[in-house]
Amino acid sequence: MHPGLLLVNLGSPASPRTKDVKAYLQEFLSDPSVIEMPAALWQPLLRGIILPTRSWRSATFYQDSWLPQGSPLIVYSQAICQQVQAALPDWNVRLAMTYGQPDIGATLKAMVADGCEKPIILPLFPQYTQSTHGGIHRQVEATGLPHTFIDSFYDQPTYIHLLATKVWQSYQAHHYDAVIFSYHSIPTAMVRHGDPYQRECEATTKAVLAERPELPADKVITAYQSKFGPMPWLKPYLKNELMQLVELGKRNVLVVTPSFVVDCLETLEEDYVQNYQTFRASGGDRFDLVPPMNKDTGFSQFLADLAIQKQEASNHAITSSSKS
């Protein structure tokens, strides 16, 4: 028997072709963790209006951001997995996706068949929210296999240090009028129902400021992006903040995206293209993004250390239980 670690990210279409994007969006947007609406109401809307109109448009965005090796989210997630495996040579480290391939259930079963007694599940999302973690939990639980979860790491000192260092390095490169910490938004109904996401996002911003007091707090803004559908989502929205900053004469901005640990459609298309164009069209000058963790070996080592800590805590709990 040997320890196992399953890293999980959101997923990506198999290709940027419209049919593959449509299949991916159908799986993603059919998850009740993502869309809190009765299926009898939501599915006709999804299949009849949203998928036919959104799939081809999203496909063009994926085509623009696709790397020669494949989806950026998959490519960078695989790189992280390989680096974590190198840091944990005695472990079985694998990668799965909530939607698309590799499948969570099949990967977890393969790990157990390979001798992993109780794999650790580590979603690659610093902050916990039902919309990302709910589907992971359901798929893992459906296997009936023993496991443990690391549900968030937004408050881990090493993670905050890594994030704060990236922000500070980028901030020093130019004179910025504002630094926006932009997190993926979620429906406000989830927060009302007890989802801790907003609290954890705000805590992340505050922790970075505490780690780097040289960063002017009066320039820092917390915002949210990637809203989908007509329901109210967490505000303020990044796009609106960008336009308002220009109106205030703040034309040089730095954007940080802590909820995305790797480049994906939201960073490469929504931010680098759409939000950049909005900002420039409004009269803004400099629009820069702090790079996500991507292939940062320090981040991969942090994930490896986090898994070791979890394994040691589990072993200690088992030992204590056997003695009592």
Curated annotation (Swiss-Prot):
Record carries keyword Nucleotide-binding: no
One Gene Ontology cellular component: cytoplasm
Residue numbers binding Fe(2+): 184, 266
Cellular localization per UniProt: Cytoplasm
Pathway involvement of the protein, from the record: Porphyrin-containing compound metabolism; protoheme biosynthesis
The UniProt record lists the keyword Lyase: yes
Catalysed reactions listed for this entry: Fe-coproporphyrin III + 2 H(+) = coproporphyrin III + Fe(2+)
GO molecular function: ferrochelatase activity; metal ion binding
Pfam short name (any one): Ferrochelatase
InterPro entries noted in UniProt: Ferrochelatase, Ferrochelatase_AS, Ferrochelatase_C, Ferrochelatase_N
Record-stated family: Belongs to the ferrochelatase family.
Protein name: Coproporphyrin III ferrochelatase
